Amino acid sequence: MSHVDDGFRSLTLKRFPQTDDVNPLLAWEAADEYLLQQLDETEIRGPVLILNDTFGALSCALAEHSPYSIGDSYLSELGTRENLRHNGIAESSVTFLDSTADYPQAPGVVLIKVPKTLALLEQQLRALRKVVTVQTRIIAGAKARDIHTSTLELFEKVLGPTTTTLAWKKARLINCTFSHPQLADAPQTLSWKLEDTGWTIHNHANVFSRTGLDIGARFFMQHLPENLDGEIVDLGCGNGVIGLSLLAKNPQANVVFVDESPMAVDSSRLNVETNLPEAFERCEFMINNALSGVEPFRFNAVFCNPPFHQKHALTDNIAWEMFHHARRCLKINGELYIVANRHLDYFHKLKKIFGNCATIATNNKFVILKAVKQGRRR
C-alpha cells in the first residue's frame, strides 16, 4: 500500500493482487504524477479517457470528472475498483471499457499510460483516431526508458504532430495533436499458420507472442496428456493454442479458456471457431482473475503457462495466485500442469502448495511440472 498526493486529491493505493511486504511494489509511478501535473482542472471539457491505468491512480484522481477507464486487463479493473472503494470514491464514477469497445466521441482529454507492446498502443491509437478532435488534449506517459523513437513515430503516424517533455523522476511525457494524417487500414488480428497442424492462429493486439508460437508453448504442446475427460482448464490461455491442442487430443473433455485479457479470450474463441468449430460446444470462455469465484472441486486438470510480469513489473504474485486457485478448483486427484522458465524454481512453490510435485520434461530453458491435489490436504 502506498500514498500519493497528486494535486487533485490525496490517495492511498495498493496493487492488485497485493505484493508481499518484504518486496513491495508501488501501485503508482512518477508517470502518473507527471500526467496529472499537466492538467489544469479548469481546462477539462468533454469526456475524459484514461488508457491503461494500471491500478487506478489516474481514475481515482480524476473521479469527479466521471472518466472512462479503457484497457485490456481485468486485473487492472479490479485493482482500480478496489482503490476507488478504499478511498471512499463511488465505483460508478468510473466507466470501464475494454480496448476493443467503441470509445466515447469528442473527448476533451486523453491520458495514456504507454503499454508494454507497440501492437496494443497502435490498436488504441487507431481507436482514438476515430473519436478525437483537433481540440482534444492527448498526453501519454511512461518511464523515460520505455519511450522510444518507435513510440513517437507511432503517435505521429496515427494521430499527428508529437513532442516529448524533459524527464522528471525518470518519467517522460508525450504530447500529441490530432491532425488527420493519412493512414492505411490495418487488420484487427495478426494471423499465422501453426506448424504441423492445419490451423491458422488469430491474435488480437495484446496477446502474448502474437507474431508466432512462443517456445514455451511449443515445448508444452509436445507433452500434453491424452485421454482426459470432464472439465479441464487452459489458465492464462492467451491465444488458446494449449486449449486448442487439448480439445484435439481429448475428445471426451470440455475445455475452459481463462485469461484476464479480453483480447486473449476473444482470440481463443476465434481460434476455436475457425479451427475446431465442431468442438466449440465443448468450450467455455471466461475473462477472470485466475479462477476467482469458480466453485471448488470442479476440474479434472488445469494447464498453465504462468506470467512473471505484470505490465512492466517483474512479479510472481500472479503465478502464485494461479497455483492456489488451481488447487482449490481441482477435484481430488486432479492435476495441475505448468510450463515455466527453469530459473523461476516453481517446483518448490508447487510442492509447498500441493505437498508434491513431479518433473514431466525439461530442456535447457523450460521445465514442465505436474502437481496432484491429494485428499489429505485442505
From Swiss-Prot:
UniProt cross-references to InterPro entries, sorted A to Z: DNA_methylase_N6_adenine_CS (IPR002052), rRNA_m2G-MeTrfase_RlmG (IPR017237), RsmC/RlmG (IPR046977), SAM-dependent_MTases_sf (IPR029063), Small_mtfrase_dom (IPR007848)
Coiled coil: none
Annotated Gene3D superfamilies: Vaccinia Virus protein VP39
Name of the gene encoding the protein in the UniProt record: rlmG
Top-rank EC class of the record's enzyme: transferase
Entry keyword annotation includes rRNA processing: yes
Catalytic activity: guanosine(1835) in 23S rRNA + S-adenosyl-L-methionine = N(2)-methylguanosine(1835) in 23S rRNA + S-adenosyl-L-homocysteine + H(+)
Domain of life: Bacteria
Organism listed in the record: Salmonella paratyphi B (strain ATCC BAA-1250 / SPB7)
EC numbers, comma separated: 2.1.1.174
Any one GO cellular component localisation term in the record: cytoplasm
Record protein name field: Ribosomal RNA large subunit methyltransferase G
Subcellular location: Cytoplasm
Family label: Belongs to the methyltransferase superfamily. RlmG family.
Keyword tags: Cytoplasm, Methyltransferase, rRNA processing, S-adenosyl-L-methionine, Transferase
A UniProt-annotated Pfam family: MTS
Function according to Swiss-Prot or TrEMBL: Specifically methylates the guanine in position 1835 (m2G1835) of 23S rRNA.
HAMAP family reported in the protein's UniProt record: 23SrRNA_methyltr_G (MF_01859)
UniProt GO MF annotations: 23S rRNA (guanine(1835)-N(2))-methyltransferase activity; nucleic acid binding
